[in-house]
């Protein structure tokens, strides 16, 4: 029965398409094509026709007695031209004149039936076939682009759809049990899982909520940085509840055809109503849910789609068990109407995992990989502060790839530690060979960071120093890992961190008496900390406890814009320079006081290229036994290389 209905609908759509095509072409052919044909035959006056006969230009004349028109030809071959004029009534001398000038002429009453039929076929038939062919090709291309390869011309309920699926939602439907994901597969997000448990409970046992008069939250907005598991949590909710799961990206709603986005929203909620209870998950909802305004950059199609989404979220019966989940990392751009209670009732933060969470995430991904006995994942967790779940999954995968590369059947601790370096700084550059002088500069630079970091009381312990160039562009790096997770930063800790960042440049100035561009990233980070101290943390003695900037795109690492006068902005710049310079001077002083250790560790690092934190601390703590033989440091802190 359904097949017969589809065939009937396709036949009607085909007839409608042909009818519209014929109408459009007839309209064009009766206005445009006759004019083009007439442009090939020049119309002249009767007197000009007689003049051309007198001057012997006319070679052939056709006297049409049916419409009293005269069509004549001048010239021959490539120079032949056709003219047309209206015969002057009662001109009895025309035939005599044509004979005198020896012009070929003919006169007849034409039978136009055959000519008219041929003319109609040429003028209307062939172009119409071409027109229909082009239209069919465009229609088929649109249907293929929308995922329908069928040869039919189904217009989705009307010719205006221009393609069978343009008004149909492209959401992927997954059965709850087919997601293969439950809360056991989600780690490091215990608070988010706890918030979602109530939604799962309602979807599984709605009667106990209806009995007391409670309604299920219509929607929940998952907010957090990229890679933290927002989509994974949404799938886990569907897996736990065992209900259908509709997944669609926000960008898939907005189309090139006006009104198609709103139609897709209607179709999505129609499908959800048919499969209720179920979950609708809209990923990156900011693509369609941006704040509406009256600016010139406003998008009417996107706003129309958003209005339809708001209407649907208000209109569906929440007792059916339809829950809308959405994810975004730009919550500040969302329309306020979308965030009000009754639409997205809950806003659930999905933040970067802490130390315990990172270890749990690593363990989940490690379950799919063969590991050597005794591999300590806590070391990796400590080495990756600020890493997302996606970063940690990548670390485990990189370790497995490295194990295969070296012919091992199990992942070792070395594979894991090296994969951390790959994710953080990139892979080793095997073909990059530094000159002896550059290698010397990099060794002192990284040692400067490490010594200043080890001396500062508030800084994290050094765990690794390397001067092996990486694909990220770094010629070396110093890794420091906190023993415990740190959630607050005091002013003294911020100043110590700036001093550590200035340690590399200070070592270059102290030992070589000049500076390189190797400290560019250190300067950038030190400046960012100092500016945050002044404009966000209220740690400036001069400007006091005020907020002077507004952060943008917090979860995407966006910058901040100043919210102060130009005069205050100048004071901010001066204060930032003062704080960074203070850290620079502290680093210089620390290295002057430990200059022999600076030489000893730098030379040791230059020989081994990579040393552990334990090796570094052993050299730093033992008595001074190293005398610099290749550098001479004067009392003012400048230095010059000694002659070899």
From Swiss-Prot:
It is an enzyme of class 3 (hydrolase). Residues 35-117 are extracellular. Its EC number is 3.4.24.-. ATP binds at residues 224-231. One of its GO terms (molecular function) is ATP binding. Binds 1 zinc ion per subunit. The active site is at residue 446. The chain crosses the membrane at residues 14-34, 118-138. Zn(2+) binds at residues 445, 449, 522. Residues 1-13, 139-644 are cytoplasmic. It holds the Pfam family FtsH_ext. Its cofactor is Zn(2+). It is found in: Cell membrane. GO terms for biological process: protein catabolic process; proteolysis. Gene3D superfamilies: 1.10.8.60, 3.30.720.210, P-loop containing nucleotide triphosphate hydrolases, Peptidase M41. InterPro entries: AAA+_ATPase (IPR003593), AAA_lid_3 (IPR041569), ATPase_AAA_core (IPR003959), ATPase_AAA_CS (IPR003960), FtsH (IPR005936), P-loop_NTPase (IPR027417), Pept_M41_FtsH_extracell (IPR011546), Peptidase_M41 (IPR000642). One of its GO terms (cellular component) is plasma membrane. Homohexamer. In the central section; belongs to the AAA ATPase family. In the C-terminal section; belongs to the peptidase M41 family. This is ATP-dependent zinc metalloprotease FtsH. It comes from Lancefieldella parvula (strain ATCC 33793 / DSM 20469 / CCUG 32760 / JCM 10300 / KCTC 3663 / VPI 0546 / 1246) (Atopobium parvulum). The gene is ftsH.
């Amino acid at each position: 029965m359904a097949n017969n209905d589809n065939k009937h609908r396709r036949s009607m759509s085909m007839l409608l398409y042909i009818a519209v095509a014929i109408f459009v072409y007839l309209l064009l052919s009766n206005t445009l094509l006759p004019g083009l044909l007439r442009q090939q035959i020049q119309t002249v006056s009767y007197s000009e026709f007689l003049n051309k006969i007198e001057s012997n230009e006319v070679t052939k004349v056709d006297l049409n007695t049916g419409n009293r028109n005269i069509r004549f030809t001048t010239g021959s071959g490539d120079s032949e031209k056709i003219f047309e004029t209206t015969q002057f009534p009662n001109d009895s001398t025309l035939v005599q004149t044509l004979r005198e000038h020896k012009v070929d002429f003919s006169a007849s009453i034409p039978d136009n039936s055959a000519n008219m039929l041929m003319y109609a076929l040429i003028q209307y038939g062939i172009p119409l076939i071409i027109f229909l062919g082009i239209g069919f090709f465009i229609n088929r291309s649109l249907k293929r682009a929308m995922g329908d390869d069928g040869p039919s011309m189904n217009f989705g309920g009307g010719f205006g759809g221009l393609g069978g699926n343009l008004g149909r939602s492209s959401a992927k439907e997954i059965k709850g049990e087919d997601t293969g994901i439950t809360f056991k597969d989600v780690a490091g997000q215990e608070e988010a899982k706890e918030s979602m448990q109530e939604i799962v409970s309602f979807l599984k046992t709605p009667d106990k909520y209806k009995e007391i008069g409670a309604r299920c939250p219509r929607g929940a907005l998952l907010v957090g940085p990229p890679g933290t598991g927002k989509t994974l949590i949404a799938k886990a909710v569907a897996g736990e509840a065992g209900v259908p799961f509709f997944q669609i990206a926000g960008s898939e709603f907005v189309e090139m055809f006006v009104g198609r986005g709103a139609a897709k929203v209607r179709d999505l909620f129609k499908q959800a109503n048919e499969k209720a209870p179920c979950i609708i998950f809209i990923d990156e909802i900011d693509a369609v849910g941006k704040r509406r305004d009256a600016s010139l950059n406003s998008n009417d199609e996107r706003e129309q789609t958003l209005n339809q989404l708001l209407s649907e979220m208000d209109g569906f019966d929440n007792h059916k068990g339809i829950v809308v989940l959405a994810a975004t990392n730009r919550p500040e751009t969302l329309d306020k109407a979308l965030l009000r209670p009754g639409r997205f009732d809950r806003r659930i933060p999905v933040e970067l995992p802490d130390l315990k969470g990172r270890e749990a995430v690593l363990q989940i991904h490690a379950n799919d990989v063969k590991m050597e006995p005794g591999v300590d994942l806590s070391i990796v967790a400590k080495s990756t502060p600020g890493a997302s779940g996606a970063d940690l999954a990548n670390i485990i995968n990189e370790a497995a790839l490295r194990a295969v590369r070296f012919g091992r059947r199990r992942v070792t601790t070395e594979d894991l530690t090296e994969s951390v370096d790959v994710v953080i700084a990139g892979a080793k550059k095997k073909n990059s060979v530094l000159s002896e002088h550059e290698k010397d500069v990099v060794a002192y630079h990284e040692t400067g960071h490490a010594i200043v970091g080890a001396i500062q009381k508030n800084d994290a312990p050094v765990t690794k120093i390397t001067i092996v160039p990486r694909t990220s562009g770094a010629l070396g790096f110093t890794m420091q890992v906190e023993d415990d997770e740190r959630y607050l930063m005091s002013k003294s800790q911020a100043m110590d961190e700036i001093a550590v960042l200035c340690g590399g440049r200070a070592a270059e100035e102290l030992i070589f008496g000049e500076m390189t561009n190797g400290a560019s990233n250190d300067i950038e980070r030190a400046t960012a900390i100092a500016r945050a101290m002044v404009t966000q943390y209220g740690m400036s003695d001069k400007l006091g406890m005020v907020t002077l900037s507004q952060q943008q795109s917090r979860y995407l690492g966006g910058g901040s814009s100043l919210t102060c006068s130009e005069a205050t902005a100048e004071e901010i710049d001066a204060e930032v320079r003062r704080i960074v310079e203070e850290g620079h001077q502290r680093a210089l002083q620390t290295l002057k006081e430990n200059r022999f250790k600076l030489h000893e560790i730098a030379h040791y690092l230059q020989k081994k290229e990579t040393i552990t934190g334990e090796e570094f601390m052993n050299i730093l703590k033992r008595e001074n036994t190293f005398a610099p033989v290749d550098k001479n440091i004067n009392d003012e802190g400048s230095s010059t290389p000694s002659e070899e």
